[in-house]
């Protein structure tokens, strides 16, 4: 599994590779606090690694040995507290949390999580199916059900809310989301096996995800792999990338304009309202 980091002033670039008993881990999520990078690999092994930013030492800090383990994302709320999540085990989402700067991780018991439907899972969508904002957390699902799992207290209590996004097929549902603040959010996805279908694939919430309204139904892009608000723009400007190209909205997602034919991009990261990195 390859990883690396760079500084925008070009003062330092670093790349490396991690092996697990000669196996190359498949990384699906990356997060950081001030001192360390954290990498989560999907399965066989499902492991969280910590990389020291100064001396570049690598430490395996968590391993899920459940044969059904498959991890999709990792984020940090603050310097001390972080969350990683994966596909269901024992009827509930897999959620692990750290409260000590990533030194130890504890799995949330299924009794404290909403029950998953058979065939419902989360997608490993370039780390954008797990969103944190302040103390708030959202996890996206698809398959038989396309729902949003929500916590207002950094993963201690959870609720699940239905969405109108297309669902009922193994590769359909919510793949990506972003929240402008703790109330206004957007979800996107669709049917990965019918990527030109632009119906029921994007929706907006103004109440933290408790209810959702479809946006531009039957218009704009089809399947979206990543959607993001432009920061510091009042929650009005939004960008989506996926196999149909790059799309832009300047009216909270009611209308979309194609601004690039690049179909090879999978994820977006805004540095500020002017600079964005797309991969």
What are these language model-derived features?
Residues 172-204:
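Oxyanion-binding "anion nests"
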Residues 32-34, 77-79, 132-134, 179-182, ...:
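Residue-level detector of Asp-centered blade-edge/turn motifs that repeat once per structural unit
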Residues 114-160:
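Loop-centered beta-sheet repeat module
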Residues 42-45, 88-92, 142-144, 194-199, ...:
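Short, solvent-exposed loop/turn segments at conserved positions within beta-propeller repeat blades
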Residues 22-25, 66-71, 114-124, 167-172, ...:
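Short glycine-/Asp-/Thr-/Trp-enriched loop segments that recur within the blades
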Residues 2-21, 45, 49-66, 95-114, ...:
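Asp-box/BNR beta-propeller loop motif
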Residues 36-38, 80-84, 136-139, 183-187, ...:
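Entry beta-strands of beta-propeller and related beta-repeat scaffolds
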Residues 25-31, 68-75, 171-176, 223-228, ...:
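Repeated scaffold domains used in trafficking and secretory/extracellular systems
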């Amino acid at each position: 599994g390859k990883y690396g980091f760079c500084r925008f002033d070009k003062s330092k670039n670093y790349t490396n590779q991690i092996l697990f008993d000669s196996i190359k881990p498949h990384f699906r999520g990356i997060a950081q606090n001030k001192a360390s990078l954290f990498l989560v690999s999907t399965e066989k092994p499902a492991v969280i690694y910590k990389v020291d930013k100064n001396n570049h030492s690598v430490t395996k800090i968590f391993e899920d040995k459940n044969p059904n383990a498959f991890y999709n994302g990792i984020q940090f709320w603050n310097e001390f507290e972080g969350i990683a999540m994966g596909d269901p085990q024992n009827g509930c989402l897999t959620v692990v949390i750290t409260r000590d700067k990533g030194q130890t991780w504890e799995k949330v018991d299924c009794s404290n999580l909403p029950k998953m439907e058979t065939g419902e899972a989360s997608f490993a969508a370039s780390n954008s199916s797990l969103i944190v904002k302040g103390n708030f957390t959202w996890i996206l699902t698809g398959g038989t059900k396309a729902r949003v799992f929500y916590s207002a207290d950094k993963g201690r209590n959870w609720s699940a809310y239905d969405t109108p996004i297309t669902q009922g097929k193994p590769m359909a549902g919510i793949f990506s989301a972003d929240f402008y603040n703790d109330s206004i959010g957007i979800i996107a996805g669709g049917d990965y096996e019918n990527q030109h279908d632009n119906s029921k694939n994007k929706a907006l919430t103004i109440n933290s995800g408790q209810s959702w309204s479809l946006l531009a139904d039957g218009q704009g892009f089809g399947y979206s792999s990543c959607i993001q608000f432009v920061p510091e723009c009042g929650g009005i400007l939004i960008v989506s990338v996926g196999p149909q190209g790059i799309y832009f909205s300047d009216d909270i997602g009611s209308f979309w304009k194609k601004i690039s034919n690049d179909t090879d991009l999978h994820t977006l990261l805004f540095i500020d309202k002017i600079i964005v990195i797309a991969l």
